[in-house]
Amino acid sequence: MTRPVVASIDLLALRQNLQIVRRAAPGSRLWAVDKDNAYGHGVARVWSALSAADGFALLNLEEAILLREQGWKGPILLLEGFFHADELAVLDQYRLPTSVHSNWQIKALQQAKLRAPLDIYLKVNSGMNRLGFMPERVHTVWQQLRAISNVGEMTLMSHFAEAENPQGIVEPMRRIEQAAEGLDCPRSLANSAATLWHPEAHFDWVRPGIVLYGASPSGQWQDIANTGLKPVMTLRSEIIGVQNLRPGEAIGYGGLYRTTQEQRIGIVACGYADGYPRVAPSGTPVLVDGVRTTTVGRVSMDMLAVDLTPCPQAGIGAPVELWGKEIKIDDVAASSGTVGYELMCALAPRVPVVTL
């Protein structure tokens, strides 16, 4: 018998989310960021629902090639660029724009034999200090790239570390303006948070990611609750066991939760091997038979326990929503000390996925 845990992907919600996000930046073109296999939703499964985007921004060649083979003919941007010089031949074959953030990549472009120039996204380090050239170096690097016959259209790109904060882009924007002074070029700066909350950063291309999937870039659902955005992924299971416990009984590994009164406990077929966070504490929200309740005790590999006190009608086979339309993934993540991004990406391969 198949375990009842399943993830469903709502493609209509995904299409509608794209429309909402596009309206937030009406003057910009839009990269749909689909890194890490579309935030765990599956690139092959969801790309057609995002085909109204102007392009897809991905992390690796395998996903880019998959999109091409699935029929996408528009732009595909490699956000971290190419990792080895010999990959440039593949970028050339599939016509993939690439970010450039290191000196060795410039040298590789100089030496490559390509059929046609590649469009380049020059990465500026505006303060996150991961990838990119410091602002004071950008003019020099720009001129180096402009002199390479393998380089086509160039765009300045950067990434904000704190765009969820009202003042979080002030200093990065100053650095970007410093880098761009005197350069007549397109820019791509805005991630999900900046797309929603910082129109001054929209420029030519925005790059929304997590918001397309109905979760908040700030990690707080209330920050996007009034936007119309809807969760795309729902993780469901069922009650597979019920325990009627006396006061003082321990639940789960380590006995972290003990009953203080007679309590009815439901056992759900879902655990950390399915992608549910092991660190989720007692009190993490969950929906059982349409009623909001909480987890109790430590999450096991294949199971977790829930309090059935608010839903006395629930028994074996009662439906459980771990996250989705009613139980927001941001709330589960916040309870677990993490972010919705991580939970989406951690969905285990053993969990069946259906599309709606």
Swiss-Prot record:
Record-level Gene Ontology MF annotations: alanine racemase activity; pyridoxal phosphate binding
Enzyme Commission no: 5.1.1.1
Any one of the GO BP annotations: D-alanine biosynthetic process
Enzyme class: isomerase
Record-level GO cellular component terms: cytosol
Residues bearing the modification N6-(pyridoxal phosphate)lysine: K35
Active site residues according to the UniProt entry: K35 (proton acceptor), Y253 (proton acceptor)
Cofactor annotation: pyridoxal 5'-phosphate
Superkingdom per UniProt: Bacteria
Keyword Isomerase: yes
Pfam families (alphabetical): Ala_racemase_C, Ala_racemase_N
Keywords: Isomerase, Pyridoxal phosphate
Reactions this protein catalyses: L-alanine = D-alanine
Positions annotated to bind substrate: R130, M301
Record's function text: Isomerizes L-alanine to D-alanine which is then oxidized to pyruvate by DadA.
Family the entry assigns: Belongs to the alanine racemase family.
Protein name: Alanine racemase, catabolic
Native source organism of the sequence: Klebsiella aerogenes (Enterobacter aerogenes)
